């Protein structure tokens, strides 16, 4: 009788590990496709760049070196980044002359990916509690606060938006790098 339960538990553990790895592979594929779509949409948002507006928002170094992060922490980092990029682009971009349809498409893509991550990470509540209070999370939130503050200080003018657009494009490249962490 005990052997039957042991075998049953072993099958469950094997199945759950396989299911998690499949989820990460699916997540990696969907994230990379989505991020490339977002990059394509960002390229369509034209404007003039004024080099005097450039600034260093100081993205946390931890996200620059994803090989040191666990898969679930990587997924949490991507989720925080996507949520904050979404919030940035919900700001007042009317001074840019950007096509609202393109911005809406970008927001839709970001929202879908955030929702997908939410579903996948729903089972990781204990890790979420650790992640929420981590220095990486706090660093990311401070980073995006600086981006939002920069736009506000520059009164959401088109030059500031072009700087932020370039920074978000860089964020998407970082997310692609983080996404490769799911292969390990």
From Swiss-Prot:
CDD domains per the UniProt record, alphabetical: IFab
Keyword Membrane: no
GO cellular component: extracellular space
Glycoprotein recorded as keyword: yes
Gene Ontology terms describing biological process: adaptive immune response; B cell activation involved in immune response; B cell proliferation; cell surface receptor signaling pathway via JAK-STAT; cell surface receptor signaling pathway via STAT; cellular response to dexamethasone stimulus; cellular response to dsDNA; cellular response to dsRNA
Signal peptide: 1-21
Post-translational modification: This beta interferon does not have a disulfide bond.
Keywords linked to the UniProt accession: Antiviral defense, Cytokine, Disulfide bond, Glycoprotein, Phosphoprotein, Secreted, Signal
GO MF annotation, one: cytokine activity
Record-linked SUPFAM superfamilies: 4-helical cytokines (SSF47266)
InterPro entries to which the protein is assigned, alphabetical: 4_helix_cytokine-like_core (IPR009079), Interferon_alpha/beta/delta (IPR000471)
Gene3D superfamilies, A to Z: 1.20.1250.10
Protein location: Secreted
Record function comment: Type I interferon cytokine that plays a key role in the innate immune response to infection, developing tumors and other inflammatory stimuli. Signals via binding to high-affinity (IFNAR2) and low-affinity (IFNAR1) heterodimeric receptor, activating the canonical Jak-STAT signaling pathway resulting in transcriptional activation or repression of interferon-regulated genes that encode the effectors of the interferon response, such as antiviral proteins, regulators of cell proliferation and differentiation, and immunoregulatory proteins.
Protein family according to the UniProt entry: Belongs to the alpha/beta interferon family.
PANTHER family: INTERFERON BETA, TYPE I INTERFERON
Subunit structure of this chain's protein: Monomer.
Record-given protein name: Interferon beta
Record organism: Rattus norvegicus (Rat)
Lineage, broadest ranks: Eukaryota, Metazoa, Chordata, Craniata, Vertebrata
